[in-house]
Amino acid sequence: MIDVNNFHYMKIGLASPEKIRSWSFGEVKKPETINYRTLKPEKDGLFCERIFGPTKDWECSCGKYKRVRYKGMVCDRCGVEVTKSKVRRERMGHIELAAPVSHIWYFKGIPSRMGLLLDMSPRALEEVIYFASYVVVNPGPTGLEKKTLLSEAEFREYYDKFPGKFTAKMGAEGIKELLEEIDLDAELKHLRDELESATGQRLTRAIKRLEVVESFRHSGNNPAWMILDVLPIIPPEIRPMVQLDGGRFATSDLNDLYRRVINRNNRLKRLLDLGAPGIIVQNEKRMLQEAVDALIDNGRRGRPVTGPGNRPLKSLSHMLKGKQGRFRQNLLGKRVDYSGRSVIAVGPSLKMYQCGLPKEMALELFKPFIMKELVQREIATNIKNAKSKIERMDDEVWDVLEDVIKEHPVLLNRAPTLHRLGIQAFEPTLVEGRAIRLHPLATTAYNADFDGDQMAVHVPLSKEAQAEARMLMLAAQNILNPKDGKPVVTPSQDMVLGNYYLTLERKEAVNTGTIYNDTNEVLKAYANGYVHLHTRIGVHAASFNNPTFTEEQNKKILLTSVGKVIFNEIIPDSFAYINEPTQTNLENKTPEKYFIAPTEIGEEGLKAYFDEQPLIKPFNKNFLGNVIAEVFNRFSITDTSMMLDRMKDLGFKFSSKAGITVGVSDIVVLPDKQDILDEHEKLVEKVTKQFNRGLITDFERYNAVIEIWTDAKDQIQNELMGSLEKTNPIFMMSDSGARGNASNFTQLAGMRGLMAAPSGEIIELPITSSFREGLTVLEYFISTHGARKGLADTALKTADSGYLTRRLVDVAQDVIVREEDCGTDRGLLVSDIKEGTEMIEPFIERIEGRYSKETIRHPETNEVIVNPDELVTAEIAKKITDAGIEEMYIRSAFTCNTRHGVCEKCYGKNLATGEKVEVGEAVGTIAAQSIGEPGTQLTMRTFHTGGVAGSDITQGLPRIQEIFEARNPKGQAVITEIEGVVDDIKLAKDRQQEIVIKGANETKSYLASGTSRLKVEVGQSVERGEVLTEGSIEPKNYLSVSGLNATESYLLKEVQKVYRMQGVEIDDKHVEVMVRQMLRKVRIIEAGDTKLLPGSLVDIHNFTDANREAFKERKRPATAKPVLLGITKASLETESFLSAASFQETTRVLTDAAIKGKRDNLLGLKENVIIGKLIPAGTGMRRYRDVEYDKAAPETEIVEEVQTTEI
């Protein structure tokens, strides 16, 4: 076997007949497969053992030689070599064709490569190949042009006139002869000359032909090899024939297709031997051609060959194509051993880094490890004995299993794996039952819930795999979300509710105002029922030993509540005592107002003091998230995960103690609801009157009515939330962020409000009832539209979002951090992203975690805030914005010079760890996942603004697709191509508006539709590329008008606009990586003296290389313009043919690659996965491969810490 890790590139080309014969182990002469009685392969047939190897290990066909000792011998009776039966997966055969046959990929593909090379139309080629016309190969004295087509009658006529003096042939033979006669160098010279003079269609064709001719010259492929004389037969194990239960056989479609070819070929041979009449031979040759076409690509020409039940047979091309093809089904995703799946259940008592594995599952997964251990401990005598012990589930097996799984992490995966947090490592603990136990805090990252979700378990086997799983993938390490660098592990539902309830304060709670010496006293009083969780008390501040308390404060009494004392137990000691849910309290110190000197307490005690003070808000979900982020910023990951576990335990404990329930009595209907409705009803009547009098249009009336009812709902909502008791369970759920929001509550107790019709428009008749009162039949009916649309949308969105992620991953999979610094001299100017006055992404968020390109000084003090190539941390970013600086140049992926990737400096910090990014990080894939994963949260709809045509703006997922596919947007904006002043705006024909721009040298006018809103007015100055009307810009046009930098910034802004409007935060750097991939090609305008072809798409780096060469040799450089490719197109244009072929249009990509003799340097991730090599990212990079692991190395500290710390 070849060691896949040892080769550096893979090349593809056309196979010569000699090459095909050299692969083959023998010629298949008969169409038979296996003997129906003996079930043994027929000699010389499609499964022949002599050609392909024995069907049983170390045994020849007739049984003369059995056993491994005869290895390598060839049986003298049956001629079969004694070897492993596995060779039947590798050995190929061949068929010697009686007549040459054209390869359908090269003749029928678009464009037809054969046609371009011969300068013949595909239709003419088809007529010749399928024996409808003759082609003139050698015109002789006939006066005919070479390659002219002749019908049967014309050929007879010329043949009679010039017998034996000219040659015209039919079928692939004629084409082969023409291909053999082609002089590529002469053709090249002729085409280069034609390029100088040709224009229009002729120029386009000349460029296409030049590309094909150049391909053949460079690749060393012979054009005649596009015609087959010998047909290879793939190994029999890859097209198997298996016996079914009923004695019948199931076989691969390929065997049928091969059988047809062999039958027709044998018949043709016989006819040629017999000297049959020409017309019969011709017909047989045509049938052979069709049989080979069907084998290579069934259905490409004419009707496909069908099997039983009119099902088209799957040809060799279909074996590669699509989701079920070889690439996507077997090479990019394989099923793996040492894996299992089961339903998940919650494991509230687990630590952050643990999961619960069902005993019987663990027994099966770790079987080989247990067997080894049983033999080593001498519990079992040998492996076989150990196996039977495990299968019997003997008692001693369980102890061994406990030891084996200790410190052996397993990977848990939930489908769909939308981002890298969809697979995480945990340390298994054994549990009873058959469900996998999952840590409740890990559910957010997996997007899992416990309503029947299933998860898969995988066991990393090698020491390196285990180390990687533990160091990089342990759930306790993955606290931050790679898309925005915020904690993804936040408490939810019960945990939030528990902590909210714990930190609640109540006025009339038992024994309010009691003063305690220390925490222990408080806990004892609480345990004995002397105080309640919500009781406000005083505690001597000194007893907390808190480093943030001043000396003065330590002499005072801290005013807090019992619950908060308990909550602060889980917070690290160096933090301020958290008494109120504010950033100041969290980051700096406990506010002074919560300290009271003993002398200040009046005679009535603290109770009277507390009665005057307002209650402090309890801690909600957002605040808990801030606490986690703050702990993460100040401490190690280990400390954070320990605190998270404590927070989870507190939450569960106190939400159970709270016993929060919901009853119908908790839903209190607003008393003055009817008055609010009547008031708004009057407003609607007023608007309708105005419309009836013709004072406003129907469009304005509709919008006004919608606005009135929205206002009514808002008013009811505000009054409802204000009138609710703070201890109302439903209010507590929504206020804490555990579940539900104000809108849900309004629907229960207030009114349901406006609903959408099936078309997406809003129905102006609101639903005035609430669920508590009950809906009328009409109201119920209206509301079903929205519910149905919601479900349908979700289903569509999931598929669309998944496909978007796949395309994004494909285009960016080879972007890896490849070096520390690329040394670029350019940077990206960043400032606030705004849409009108609305802030989309603030400046501070854009610079944090990036490297500066310039020295930034304080405008007043001139002090240096940040130096060039220095990382802008959160503190520095705050300093910059506090200094009033509103824009700066940063290092960006847009301006990075690294080939096939980015450098550390241009990328910035790794958001998943908060540290600087390391060489080897697969940032392209992370970027694709970060943009694709929130795709399901985006809306599907195109907003209809009251049904006016032309003003629909695409938003949500469709808009993201539109941007990344570089499509012409819906509701396109008009942009100006010149700088100048708006001279005039007038009405043109067909109710269009004409905008006239007067520049320095020229005046241009632009037409906009009558309904589009203008963004400029007469006399206004405009820059090149400025928007004249509302809408989205067409990016390809913008690129040619405003240039590369403006287009990059525009695309970045547009993507951020869509996501931020939906409340999804994605870091700029992810979008930058993707947009850069879309702009990495240029189109050659003039080739100069370089080897580049005019009109061809070339990678920017190859273009600069070619020009550098030209400058060195004092030659004319090439000129080119940047091209914006959509992600699908960009994936197919990638350097790697393996990656492109596994993505889409497999046959087209492979045809092209074979003719060009392309070489795949295996730089990306996909191509390495396909050939089974370690991926060149992370520890798979060559610079890390030479590192040997030390077998006796002591375990790292962090791991020890995770293991031994009890919480």
From Swiss-Prot:
One of its GO terms (molecular function) is magnesium ion binding. Mg(2+) binds at residues 449, 451, 453. Zn(2+) 1 binds at residues 60, 62, 75, 78. The keyword Signal does not apply. Its EC number is 2.7.7.6. Binds 1 Mg(2+) ion per subunit. Its cofactor is Mg(2+); Zn(2+). It comes from the Bacteria. InterPro entries: DNA-dir_RpoC_beta_prime, DNA-dir_RpoC_beta_prime_bact, RNA_pol_asu, RNA_pol_N, RNA_pol_Rpb1_1, RNA_pol_Rpb1_3, RNA_pol_Rpb1_3_sf, RNA_pol_Rpb1_4. Coiled coil: none annotated. Keywords: DNA-directed RNA polymerase, Magnesium, Metal-binding, Nucleotidyltransferase, Transcription, Transferase, Zinc. GO terms for biological process: DNA-templated transcription. PANTHER family: DNA-DIRECTED RNA POLYMERASE, DNA-DIRECTED RNA POLYMERASE SUBUNIT BETA. DNA-dependent RNA polymerase catalyzes the transcription of DNA into RNA using the four ribonucleoside triphosphates as substrates. The RNAP catalytic core consists of 2 alpha, 1 beta, 1 beta' and 1 omega subunit. When a sigma factor is associated with the core the holoenzyme is formed, which can initiate transcription. This is DNA-directed RNA polymerase subunit beta'. It comes from Staphylococcus saprophyticus subsp. saprophyticus (strain ATCC 15305 / DSM 20229 / NCIMB 8711 / NCTC 7292 / S-41). The lineage of its organism: Bacteria, Bacillati, Bacillota, Bacilli, Bacillales.
